[in-house]
Each structure stands twice: as C-alpha cells, then as structure tokens.
Amino acid sequence: MYLLILFIPLLSAFVTGFFGNFLTKNGTTKIASSFIFITCIIAYIVFYEVCFCQAPCELTLGYWINAASFKLLWGLKFDSVTAVMLVVVLTISTVVHIYSISYMGHDPHINRFMAYLSLFTFFMLVLVTANNYVQMFVGWEGVGLCSYLLINFWYTRIQANKAAIKAMLVNRVGDISIIFALVSIFATFNAVDYKSVFSLAYVYANSTISIFNYDLNILNFICICLFIGAVAKSAQVGLHIWLPDAMEGPTPVSALIHAATMVTAGIVVICKSSELFEYAPMALLIVTIVGAITAFYAATIGLVQNDLKKVIAYSTCSQLGYMIFACGISGYNVSMYHLTNHAFFKALLFLSAGSVIHSMQDEQDMRRMGGLLKVLPFTYSMFLIGSLALLGFPFLSGYYSKDFILELAFANYTIEAHFAYILGTLAAFCTAFYSVRLLLLTFFGKTNAHQAVFMQAHDAPLLIAGPLTILAILSIFIGYFFKDMAIGVGSDFWNGALTVLFTNNATIEAEFLPFTIKIFPVVISLLGCVMAIIIYDYCTKYLMQITNNSFFRELYIFLNKKWYFDKLYAETIYQNVLYLSYNPLYTVFDKGIFNILGPRVLTNTLEKLSMYVSEMQTGFFYHYALIFLISLTILIILSSINFFILLIILFILFFFIFKKENK
C-alpha cells in the first residue's frame, strides 16, 4: 500500500500527459483529481499507522547504483516527518486539483496543466519519502523542473518566460551547493543513506576539512552547503528574488508551490538532517540569522505591494523565515508544526485570491478593486479566515505555531536567538498590517473597478467554494488539535525522526515564560491591525500628505524597490556577466582567437595540404610505392609492434608489387 503513494501520482501524470487528448478535458480532470484523492486517503492511513501507532516503516526496493565502494539502494522511509509531509502535500494537492477543474476549465491546455500538477506532486513525494540524500536530490531537482514548467505554463507570455528562467537559474545556485554537500557526505561517511550518516554524526563532530588553508569543521561545512540549498529553494534572503516573479504562473500553481511543495522542500531537508545540524553550531548560527532577517525583510516589502498575489507571496517568504530560524534555535518540531499550519491557511489565501481574480476578469491590482464585500461575501469570509490565521489571531492555527516560535526564541539565552525574537516580533507587526490592508483595499470602501467588470463579478462556484471551505476548516482547527502532539512537552509524536541535543532544547523554558512575554506578540499583531484600519479606513485623505514627507517617501521607495536587491544584482552580477560574456569571451575568443585558430586555420591548412597532395598525383607507380614505403616506415617507428615482423611483411609486399610491375 505504501508504494501506491508514489505510483498513483506518477500514473496520473503519465495518463493525463500522454492520453489527455483522447480523454477530453472532463475525463482528464476527473482522472487526475480522483487519482490524487485516492493517494491522499492512503496518506492519512500511513499517518495514522506511523504517527499514532508508532510504527515507522522503511522499504528497500533494490540496488540503484552498485559501483565499487559506492552502493546505493532505492528505498522509502516512512517516519513521522514523512507522514506529516505526505498529509500536507497530498491534501493541498487534492484541493488544488479540484479547484483547477473550475479555475482552469476555460484553458485549452488543461490536460498539460493537470499532468504537470501530478508530476509536481510525485517529485515532492519522492523528496519526502527518500531514505538517502541522492534519492532526495532526485525529488529536489524534480520539483525545480516542474516549477519551471508550471510558472512558464502560459509560455507565450514573455514575463512568464523570464520568471521561469529566473526561478531555474537562482535554484541552480542551491543545487550546486547541495551537490557539494552530497560529495562531502560520501567522502566523510562513505555512505549517503540517512541511517548510516546520522549514526556516525557524533563521531565526526570535531573533524575538520581544510579549505584555502582554513580549517573548517566538516559537519559545519556539510550543513552550510545543505542550508544554501534550502536558502534557494525556500526563498531566503539573498536567493529569494525568484519567488515573487513565480506569480506569473496560474493561481493554483502559486498555491501548490507556496503552500506545500517547492518552498517547503528546504525546511524538510533541514529537519530531516537535524542530527547533523545539532553537531554544527556555526551552521545553526547562520540559519538563525538568515531566517530572522528573511522574516523581517519580506514582511516590510509586503507593506507596500499592490499586487494581490505578490502580497501573499511575500508573506510566504516571511513565514518561511520563521520556520528557518526556528530550525536554527533547534526547534525542528515547532518548524514542522508551523509548516503544517501555514500550508493550509496559505493555500486558502492563494485560492481565495484566485477566486477574486477570476471574478474580476483577471485583475490583480488591489487599487483597482474595493467594495467587493457585497458581491463576493463567501470569498471575503474565506479571505478573512486566512488573513486572521496568518497574522496570528488568537485561537486560529497561526496563533499557536508562530507565537510559540517567538517564545522559543526568547527562551534561548543566546544573542542570535534574541536577535531573531526582535526581528520576528517586528515581522509580526508588519504581517498584521499588510493582511488588514489587503482586506481593506480589496473588499471595503468604494470600488475602483471598471463598472462593467464590477457588475459581472460573481462569487465562487461550487468547485471553487468546496476546496476553500475545506481549507478554512483546517485553518481554524488544525493548530489546536495538532499542538500537543507536535510541540507538547514529553510528546513522542516525532518518535526519533527529529533530533535535538539536550543542551539546545529550550521547550520547557518556553512553556513557563511570563504571561506578558507570551501575550506580547499578540498585542503587537493587534496593534498592526488597528494601525492599518486607522490609516486605510479613517485617515485615507492623509496618505498623500504622508508620502509627501521626504523621509516617508524615501522609505516607501526603498521598500517598493525591495531593498534594491534587484538593482544590486542587476548592476553587480547581470551587467558584468553580460559584458564579460560578450566583449572578452564572444568577440575576442569565440569570434576572434578560436575562429582564427579553429575553422579558418583548419580550412586553409587542409586546402593547401590537398593542393600539395594533388601535385603528388604523378601517375607513376614507383612514386606511389615510395610514398607507401615512407608512410609505412613512419608507422613502424611510431608503433610498438615487433620491427622485424614488419620488415618481413614489407619485403613480401614489395616482392608482389615489383613482380606485378614486371609482368
């Protein structure tokens, strides 16, 4: 049964991709959705057996690579982390498939779309079920490929082409780093399977590697390489630039990428490698700092975005920062808990945004909306639930996980943890502000939409409303019901799938923090909500005066330009690489030196050589015999064959030649 979890999505991708034109749109969508739904049911059975019955399972299918000392088995590992990810991935994938039946129903290429979605799901399942790093890398590359295909689904749009190429190239940086990590793991442990590597981690805790005459702890090096891969895949600061542009794909793709698949891959790899990270303190320090900066950075950019989907995209980037710095302070269980909660309310937000965009004739600018509460009441209620869960409103799913991450950071008595707490709290304020701003600009006030568009706006049909309702229920209740299992003191839910050294465990301290510390993030979030309501509801006439102020105008430009990351990369990397590629390499080497020394010299040499050879065609047999003799002599000198044997052969040949000439 466990094998069906991988086999059915692959079969769905194969059938819809190769036979979709014979099955019609209706048949293709039903087959793909049914296959993924069946897989989702199996995933819940696996979740029950592995997590509740404490029965982790590992399957070995056979040898994949068997070369000298490198032996690699193709196997599947079903532990608690895998079981949770199976439920998250397949639940989101199921609702996205059903949602796409209505949302993409008008598209003539829906067969290809369904095939890509199923293939995306398959590769994510390969990643989370792998029992070794090489097999994990197959899934890692697969989700990268499928993200390229889905972002570039409407391939006639130039912006979609650019966004897909950008996502692919940025993720190549992380992929190269993952390859370095894999090579280092095999060179150190002489194995790549999780069981062997993790069992030997403590042995190499103090081993070093020399890089440019600098001794670096080998586990620090491996974990930093793994983390750089996670930075690219999970859109952390520095390699985050592909994520907002990924909004060029269809909205269901955005929900699948940002909620359950590609961006969570980096978090899963870090959590599965917790045994290595616990013995790599420098790597944990870097993880904490980068995650905290990302959480704050992305939240500040979300304050000034006007594109509906990009606001939600930057909120994803910010929430991923929370998960990353939770891993950095050894809160792997809290990170997985927040990943689970975030998946459902973020999918709800994206699919609700798709419902709004669909009803507004593909309009995404919030400044051209407004007043949609009366015409889209159901979609508004779904958006409200998702936004409140995102900002951490009490007793919704985001409240339990995000606040506990901040409590855990406060309870870790280290400088980097308190740094993460400060930036995380500021990010919580910004998150609340832009979440309420999104609701006010989209659903309240007077409409700024074109009259014809506004009059034709309609609420979500059944195939869109159904998935939204399921996600809304999960966004409300999953955090409460999952809390004690995932992060409760003394819980054995993870059953050894996550490793935390006792010196790094601050869960008990976080449970007994003062009430003022626990309530502080909630107060900050409510303050952000109130400020957004005051500015965008009661004081809208003062917005222009605020932007006329030089300080606020420069601040707005700075945030709207995304902290000038795109400008920095364009001027320092893109332009220099383009200049270097064209001027020295293309014009001097390719068109100059290589062209002269290569084709031109070769053609001239061959032409002169052929003329010289043609002059040797005298028609006299003894001339040809002389050439033959000289050539054969040269070959004899250059060869290692016995010289006397060749002399005998040469004598016999000349005997027959001269005998024939005398005749």
Where are these regions (language model features)?
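Hydrophobic alpha-helical membrane-insertion segments
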Residues: 34-51, 174-186, 383-391, 467-487, ...
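Alpha-helical transmembrane segments
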Residues: 13-17, 97, 299-301, 438, ...
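Hydrophobic transmembrane alpha-helices and their helix-loop junctions in integral membrane proteins
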Residues: 92-136, 145-455, 474, 480
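Transmembrane helix-loop-helix hairpins at membrane boundaries of multipass inner-membrane proteins
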Residues: 1-3, 7, 18-115, 192-213, ...
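Aromatic-capped, Gly/Pro-kinked transmembrane alpha-helices
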Residues: 49-63, 67-80, 489-523, 538-663
